[in-house]
Amino acid sequence: MTILEFKRYFKSELSELYTEAESAQLYSIFLYEKTGFDRFQQRRFAHQELLISDEEELQEITSELKTGKPYQQILGHTEFYGKKFFVDENVLIPRPETEELVELAKIEIQNLKSKIQNLKLLDIGTGSGIIPITLKKHFPNSEISAMDISEKALEIAQKNADFHKKEINFIQADFLNTELTEKYDIIISNPPYIGIDENPEIEDSVKGFEPNIALFSPTSDALIFYKKIAKDGEKHLNENGMIFLEINQKLGKETLELFSNYSESRLIKDLSGNDRFVFAKK
């Protein structure tokens, strides 16, 4: 099979799942992954025969994509904030909104850094570790801890930290049943915020392939994590300490109200105009 023949096969097989533009992008991604050919070379060598091993692997990838499996899981990695991060079925695939959360935190932390030299930061529900590792890159002198209930998720997080050569204190714990013992300057979190009653609205490709424990609240209360974060923050944030949260866009006002006792709290929209973040300052 030539490269051009595979391209036609790939698009035909995935036509019911992806638009032509999406399948073209995926084709280029996976062909580059297997052959090393960039987009120009893919066109230039369109009539070149694929190695049998590459052809077999690409056909297997096509079959996996047809099941709805996210392409990032098939690749085994994705991009976040311009950097490569490993992912698998035990962690959520990073969304663009979480990049916005990190950007928001980065701007506010830069202002706080003039007052505090060695920041202490806690990430709750770290998953693949994208948030603490990215912030460590920007604030190398900070002391960062990251908590998750899943041992397998933390294995991926540690793999990412090792890959980026960043020291993060990973903690396996159930946050909802854990008493914090230290104080922090920053608490940041993108916790499970989808209510059980919203389950039918979630795409099958998400429900079927990404960890439900990272998506859905463990109870009917979609705000359960935010309530504990608000309570813990009152006790475990240092003076001028800040909280950054990614939230359920349908529960913006309700989430913001949890931080009414803080000196400052704001509901912030994402680039799509949805209520997506809450910022609070002690």
Residue ranges and their predicted role:
Residues 45-46, 60-139, 144, 149-159, ...:
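SAM-dependent Rossmann-like transferase core, predominantly class I methyltransferases
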